[in-house]
Amino acid sequence: MTDVNGAPADVLHTLFHSDQGGHEQVVLCQDRASGLKAVIALHSTALGPALGGTRFYPYASEAEAVADALNLARGMSYKNAMAGLDHGGGKAVIIGDPEQIKSEELLLAYGRFVASLGGRYVTACDVGTYVADMDVVARECRWTTGRSPENGGAGDSSVLTSFGVYQGMRAAAQHLWGDPTLRDRTVGIAGVGKVGHHLVEHLLAEGAHVVVTDVRKDVVRGITERHPSVVAVADTDALIRVENLDIYAPCALGGALNDDTVPVLTAKVVCGAANNQLAHPGVEKDLADRGILYAPDYVVNAGGVIQVADELHGFDFDRCKAKASKIYDTTLAIFARAKEDGIPPAAAADRIAEQRMAEARPRP
């Protein structure tokens, strides 16, 4: 079902002619009193209620917002399937600059729209929305995760996200070098924010050599002051050219692997927390042609979604960490499937996810 009454022609064209097809439901939301304009996209509920965050962003057009919601919802179906969750994929986008129009009234109105879906969609934080925002949304909608601990939530998910990426690195090491240990391996991390700085801690604890960069020089300085063994370089271009780099971890913006970076990348493995690391589908073949092993981003960075899903059942950190530790086995299985089928790891991950969704019991 798609609610389309009064939708502009370009929005309808995006809905029905997108190459990200197959969505079960798309809801266009508007609340004039608060200024809310939003899109909720449910790609699949085959595995269970759709789970995915709410992005608050100043899209150039409503059609662009719809296209982003469709793409992100589809991605969440695959991420949740590979994380072993009993959840399908969904995503919501709120149109507008959060610095200008975000208000309690708007978030409450949004919560009412999510609640109207009766549990088919469970929301959480994403770009432009935060724990405090989810606390407000939850006042109107019980299908809300990513809340503060004071309001029954789990809070910051960066700890488990970094732990999952770390497990992905260990799996890549096992596959490529026959040993999961990262001791004496050189790992370059681009982006040492909430996730990246936790990743630094995991790697140092195991005895890895760590090289970092970030556009925020004060953040880099804080890390090198705490850990004098960490080496800082000027920018990502310098990082990907570091001699004897074993693993490259993009942990900032998407599109880090592109036609400019892949030809000069010195690492043997790419495994990081950033979303949408491949600038276009052909990039993974370029990596394979250079003998670089790619750990699919949506598989290794699933620690965060594992946490918000667990919140629905009463958050337990140890239970979540045990689930996130399985990212190691999942990543190994992807590498094995890729080798068996003669395809890149990202394509292998997609096949495994699609198989799990296809085998799931259809839900009304």
UniProtKB/Swiss-Prot annotation:
Gene Ontology annotations of biological process type: valine catabolic process
Induction notes from the record: By valine.
A Pfam family that the UniProt record links to this protein: ELFV_dehydrog_N
InterPro entries referenced in this protein's UniProt entry, alphabetically: Aminoacid_DH-like_N_sf, Glu/Leu/Phe/Val/Trp_DH, Glu/Leu/Phe/Val/Trp_DH_C, Glu/Leu/Phe/Val/Trp_DH_dimer, Glu/Leu/Phe/Val_DH_AS, Glu/Phe/Leu/Val/Trp_DH_bac/arc, NAD(P)-bd_dom_sf
Entry GO CC: cytoplasm
Top-level EC class as recorded in UniProt: oxidoreductase
EC number: 1.4.1.23
Principal cellular location given in the protein's record: cytoplasm
Organism classification: Bacteria, Bacillati, Actinomycetota, Actinomycetes, Kitasatosporales
Subcellular location: Cytoplasm
Assembly and oligomerization: Homodimer.
GO molecular function: valine dehydrogenase (NAD+) activity
Pathway membership, UniProt: Amino-acid degradation; L-valine degradation
Keywords for the protein's UniProt record, in alphabetical order: Branched-chain amino acid catabolism, Cytoplasm, NAD, Oxidoreductase
Summary of pH dependence: Optimum pH is 10.5 with valine as substrate.
Gene: vdh
Recorded superkingdom: Bacteria
SUPFAM superfamilies reported for this sequence: Aminoacid dehydrogenase-like, N-terminal domain, NAD(P)-binding Rossmann-fold domains
Residues that coordinate or bind NAD(+): 191-197
Function noted in UniProt: Oxidative deamination of branched-chain amino acids. Oxidizes L-valine and L-alpha-aminobutyric acid efficiently, and L-isoleucine and L-leucine less efficiently. Does not act on D-valine. The catabolism of L-valine is the major source of fatty acid precursors for macrolide biosynthesis and a vital source of antibiotic precursors. Uses NAD; no activity was found with NADP.
Family statement drawn from the similarity comment of this UniProt entry: Belongs to the Glu/Leu/Phe/Val dehydrogenases family.
Region forming the signal peptide: none
Active site: 91
Protein name, UniProt field: Valine dehydrogenase
